[in-house]
Amino acid sequence: MGSTIVEKIFSRKCGSDIKAGEVVMAPIDGAMIHDITGPLAIRKFYEMGGKQVFDPKSVIMLFDHQIPADSLEAAENHVFMRKFAAEQGIHNYDINEGVCHQVVLEKGRAAPGEIVVGADSHTCMYGAVGAFATGIGSTDMGFALKFGALYFKVPETVRAEISGKFQKRVGAKDLILSIAADIGADGATYQAIEFTGKTISKMDMAGRMTCCNMAIEMGAKAGIVPPDKVTWEYMKGRRKITPFALASDDDAKFAEKRTYNVADLEPQVAVPHNVDQGIPVGKVEGTHIDQVFIGSCTNGRYEDLVEAAEVLGKKKFDPKVRVLVIPASRDEYLKALEAGLVERFVRAGALVEAPCCGPCMGGSFGLIAAGEVSLATSNRNFRGRQGSTEGKVYLCSPATAAASAIKGEITDPREV
C-alpha cells in the first residue's frame, strides 16, 4: 500500500513509515503567531516554564488584525509582542507588512514537505506550496514555541481531482465555494484535502492559495497541492531549496475521492450565514448590497486585484455602495500600485486601504450595521463576522465583487 502526500511528509519528519490515524510527536519547521493569538500563546509559553523558543529563525511573528492599533489593548499587545521578539531574537513582521498568511508565503517561511503550524485557522493556506500546514490553539502554540514539536493525529486524505477549463470570469474562488457546498461545512473534519488534476496543474499560485485557504471551511485539518513546476518557480528567490518529488502514490489509501469538472461551473456566491451555502450567482442576482470588500488572505493578491480591475475597466462603482479594496500585503500593494490598479480603483470610487485583515475579522474597521449587506471576497460569512449579527455577508470572487459594486447589487460578472 502506497502513501498519501501527507503520510509522506510525516514519515520524512518522523523517520519511519507513518500512516493516517497514527498519533505522533512530530518536529515542526515553523510556528506562526499574530497580534490576536500571539499574546496568549506567549503567556502559555512562559507558564510552561519557557525561557527560550526552540529556534528563533523558525518562529514567525506578524501584526495584521488590529493595525494600526485601534484600541489601547491592541497597542499594549503590540508592545508586549515586540518586546518578546526582541528578547528572543525573532524577526517581527510589524504593521507595515500585510496579512500573516500572505506574508508567510511571500517570505518563503513555508516550503514543500515542511510541517508548519499557526495560531490561526487559515494557516492551511501554506499547503499551496506543498507544506502540511494547520491551525492550532494558543496552548498548543505555547508548547510548540518551547519544544519545536507537537502531537499530531495524522489525518486521512480526501482527494479532489479537478479537470476542465474555466469559463471567462470564473476561477479558483468559484471552484472552492462549489467544493465547500458539495462537501459541507463539516464533511472533511480532521481530514486533509489534496487538490490535484489538470486544472490545478495549470492554476497559478494565487489560485492555489485561495483553494487551500478555505479547506478549513469544510472542517479540514489541511489543504495541500503536490509541488510541481509552478511551486518550484514560486519558491525561487524565496528559499534556497532543491526541487524534489513529493506526491501521493497511485495506490495510496484515500478516505474519499471526489472529481470536479469546471467547464460548466458558474460564478458562485455563498449566501448567509454559512460558507457551504454556495450557489450560482444567478440565484441571488439583484440582491441589494451596501458594501463590497475586495481583499483578505483569500483574495487580496495582485492577481485578484487584476481580476477585479478587468471587470471594472473604465467604469465607476455605484456611489451608494461602499467599496473597500485591501491588498493582502505590502508587496501585493506595490505591484498593484505600479500597474496603475490603485489609481483605477480610487478613481472608480473605492477606498484603498493599507494591507491588513480589515473587515474580515469583524473588529477593526469596515463593519456593517444591522440590516446592511456586505459582499466580500474573504473566507467566512458567519453571523456577525463583519459587524452586526443582524447584518448579512455574502462571499464571492473578485470578479463578482467588482461587477456587483458597479451595478449596486449582486451581479453575474459575465454580464458586465
From Swiss-Prot:
Q: Give yes or no: UniProt keyword DNA repair.
A: no
**What does the record give as cofactor?**
[4Fe-4S] cluster
Q: Which GO terms describe its biological process?
A: L-leucine biosynthetic process
User: For this protein, what is the EC number?
Assistant: 4.2.1.33
CDD domains in the record: IPMI
An annotated Gene Ontology molecular function: metal ion binding
Question: What pathway is it annotated to?
Answer: Amino-acid biosynthesis; L-leucine biosynthesis; L-leucine from 3-methyl-2-oxobutanoate: step 2/4
Residues that coordinate or bind [4Fe-4S] cluster: 297, 357, 360
User: How are cofactors bound according to the entry's free-text note?
Assistant: Binds 1 [4Fe-4S] cluster per subunit.
Question: What's its top-level EC category?
Answer: lyase
- What's the catalysed reaction? (2R,3S)-3-isopropylmalate = (2S)-2-isopropylmalate
Matching entries from SUPFAM superfamilies are given as: Aconitase iron-sulfur domain
Q: Could you tell me which Pfam families the record lists for this protein?
A: Aconitase
Q: Which domain of life is it from?
A: Archaea
Disulphide linkage map = none
The entry's keywords: 4Fe-4S, Amino-acid biosynthesis, Branched-chain amino acid biosynthesis, Iron, Iron-sulfur, Leucine biosynthesis, Lyase, Metal-binding
Q: Which Gene3D superfamilies match?
A: Aconitase, domain 3
Q: How does it assemble?
A: Heterodimer of LeuC and LeuD.
Which NCBIfam families does this chain map to? hacA_fam, IPMI_arch, PRK00402.1
Q: Which PANTHER family match?
A: HOMOACONITASE, MITOCHONDRIAL-RELATED, ISOPROPYLMALATE_CITRAMALATE ISOMERASE LARGE SUBUNIT
Q: Which family is it part of?
A: Belongs to the aconitase/IPM isomerase family. LeuC type 2 subfamily.
Function as written in the Swiss-Prot or TrEMBL entry: Catalyzes the isomerization between 2-isopropylmalate and 3-isopropylmalate, via the formation of 2-isopropylmaleate.
Record's protein name: 3-isopropylmalate dehydratase large subunit
Give the species: Methanoregula boonei (strain DSM 21154 / JCM 14090 / 6A8)
Q: What is the gene name? A: leuC
